[in-house]
Amino acid sequence: MDKIANLALSLKEDMIKDRRYFHSHPETGWFTFFTTAVLAKRLSELGYEVKLGEEVVKSDARLGVGSKEQCQKAIERAKSLLNPNEAKYLECMKDGLTGLTAFIDTKRPGKFSAFRFDIDSVDVTESAEAAHRPCKEGFGSDIAGITHACGHDGHMAMGLALAKLIAKNLDDFNGKFKFIFQTAEEGTRGAVAMEAAGVLDGVEYLLGGHIGFQAETNGGIVCGTNKLLATSKFDVHITGRSAHAAGAPEEGANALLAAAQMALNMHGITRHAKGVTRINVGVLRAGEGRNVIAPNGYLACETRGEDTNLNEFMYKKCMDIVKGVSEIYDVESKVVMTGGTSGANSDKEVTEIFYEAAKQSPFIDDDKIVKELDFGACEDFAHFMRALQDRGAKSGYMMIGTNLKAGHHNSKFDFDEECLVAGVDIYLRAAYKLNGAKK
């Protein structure tokens, strides 16, 4: 093994320990207070300039924030878990301004390269079965209804390890590095607000990735991920008028029927010839009683498109339906955006960097290297990608192979921690290719 492989392998136990620590204390959405504070302390100790709060999140650009009560409850939980040196970071995160960036400068001319790692968990109750390894080995989620069932705990562990290796070997590099630890990836809620705060300013290369998905076994990798779909997440709140269903139905305005009509019409939208489009109404709730004209209704919806224009086509059609059906049923409807991201493709140059790194890595099997693959789903990273590419910068997204016990967002989700070494090895090789000092 070469120097880079040995460096990655040297932090294997640290990464496993970090992954399990974050797994034990999951947080969702904008309420990743504990997670952000722990990361901030660790990165500060490594010599990074850490920024939090309003410096990295534009408050009014956030979507799907949650209630003040939920926010305060999450803060109190974080306080109970943090030591004083960690808890001091909470003040600048109040109101849910979580996530952070960490910056380090070699003081030598060179590229400005960045890495993004997501940090939030998902609203899934973790399996309590004895065979489930986090349960069996004592690092299961400490809170009901929330768990790291998408691998972001592993991403954070890799991010910390990579930050440590770059900081400890800074003489090997030129230029600048930034680490973006993004919250609210689930529901595609976080990237827009962080980008609006300027976290990408000056960045020339942004690298990201995810364990699993189409890289389904240890030793595998997808070097360039394409067709990350654009998406819009929105709720429709419908207000009608209640009335007795038999005695005075004409006095009512039926929000239930309006909601049902909207759902059916949305699913009937003609698809676009220029690429993949998707629509889903995932939740429909309405009504208050058997003999009452339903005065309220609610839809939770999402559109997707192969690119941003295709997604906009679907979203506009949905808005036309909401407006038209509301007029027909004499109801009022309010649309609330809860998330969304752009569509994007990995730059060929970054794909090539990951590909060359994979061929050199002893932790990647040659017969499991896939150079490019379509993702066919959404990832909040795509907003960062698109924003940078529109400025002439480069970005790419890989998938790191791992054996999974169950699929992403499944209550039994767990991954083989060997993939953490492979992931850090690839990221570190990419860092050397982009910013390595000529000696």
Model features per residue range: what roles?
Residues D2-H148, A161, D172-F173:
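Acidic/His- and Gly-rich active-site-bordering loop/insert found
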Residues F22, F115, H152, F179, ...:
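Divalent metal-coordination and catalytic microenvironments
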Residues Y89-K94, E185, G224-L228, E372-G376:
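Short Gly/Pro-enriched turn/cap motifs at secondary-structure boundaries
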Residues M156-L162:
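DPxDG-like acidic metal-binding loop motif
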Residues L257-K439:
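Metal-dependent amide/peptide-bond hydrolase catalytic core
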